[in-house]
Regions:
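Short amphipathic alpha-helix that is part of the acyltransferase structural core
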Residues: 1-27, 110-149
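A structural preference for long, well-packed, hydrophobic secondary-structure segments
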Residues: 2-3, 12, 192, 197, ...
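Short secondary-structure junctions
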Residues: 2-4, 39-42, 92-99, 122-126
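Conserved donor-binding loop and adjoining core beta-sheet/short helix segment
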Residues: 16-76, 175-191, 196-197
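A short, aromatic/hydrophobic, helix- or strand-capping loop or linear motif
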Residues: 24-32, 81-85, 145-155
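Acyl-donor-binding surface of acyltransferase catalytic domains
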Residues: 50-121
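Conserved acetyl-CoA pyrophosphate-binding loop and the N-cap/start of the following alpha-helix
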Residues: 68, 198-199, 203-210
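A mid-sequence, solvent-exposed acidic-amphipathic segment
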Residues: 133-189, 194
Length: 210
């Protein structure tokens, strides 16, 4: 049975379901540790399942009975779930909306830098500790609610050394950002890489270097 994580046994099930997983093995345990008593997060565990709910979206590690999972998500008001379909059958009656791809890089390895406009790069300023709100506004310029949620989450992780974000400035404008938003369990989950529309395709994002 899927139940809210409220006991040591539930927590152990949750963490066991996440163990050894790419991305989910970092993000879900970290979120449980930091936000288990915060809204809008909710955390649930089954015998072989870890489930994180935030708003109308769920993240799942491990697997569960498809019928039980479908009923539970409907009860919780979820509209979408992110899962590894090689491990977790989709909830009964649900259809796949899109495929998300995860790329992994082994510890100690590095990717080659792509070609970039060096003249443009020379006019940019690298900020290794950008304001959380500046990053939030760059990522969600038209959604103040998402800005506030992102700001709160990033500040919580940063103060505990669990997130690292860089940004590029062109004058007074944040034109590119990328971050490791879950530093946990020997993983660094990188996400929210975004470049301002007029500068996309110029190799800027791949040039972050310290």
């Amino acid at each position: 049975m899927i139940a809210q994580v409220s006991t040591k046994a539930h927590r152990a099930r949750f963490l066991n379901a996440c163990r050894g997983k790419w991305v989910l093995g970092a993000t879900l345990p970290l979120d449980l540790a930091l936000f288990s008593k915060s809204q809008p997060w909710r955390f649930y565990a089954g015998p072989t399942l870890a489930l994180e709910l935030s708003g109308c979206t769920a993240w799942a590690a491990g697997h569960a009975n498809p019928e039980e999972l479908a009923s539970f998500l409907a009860f919780c008001g979820c509209e979408s779930i992110i899962l590894d379909e090689n491990e977790c059958p989709p909830p009964a009656g649900w259809c796949k909306a899109e495929t998300l791809t995860v790329f992994g890089l082994a510890p100690g390895k590095a990717l080659p830098l792509p070609a970039a406009d060096e003249t443009l790069w020379a006019g940019l300023t690298l900020d290794r500790e950008p304001s959380a709100m500046d990053v939030a506004r760059a990522l969600y310029p038209a959604d103040t609610a998402k800005q506030e949620d992102f700001y709160s989450e990033l500040c919580t992780k940063r103060t505990r050394g669990k997130a690292l974000v860089w940004a590029l400035w062109q004058g007074s404008e944040t034109i590119c950002t990328v971050g490791a938003y879950a530093l946990a369990n020997r993983q660094a989950y990188m996400a929210c890489g975004q470049t301002a529309q007029p500068l996309r395709g110029k190799g800027i994002g791949g040039q972050f270097r310290g």
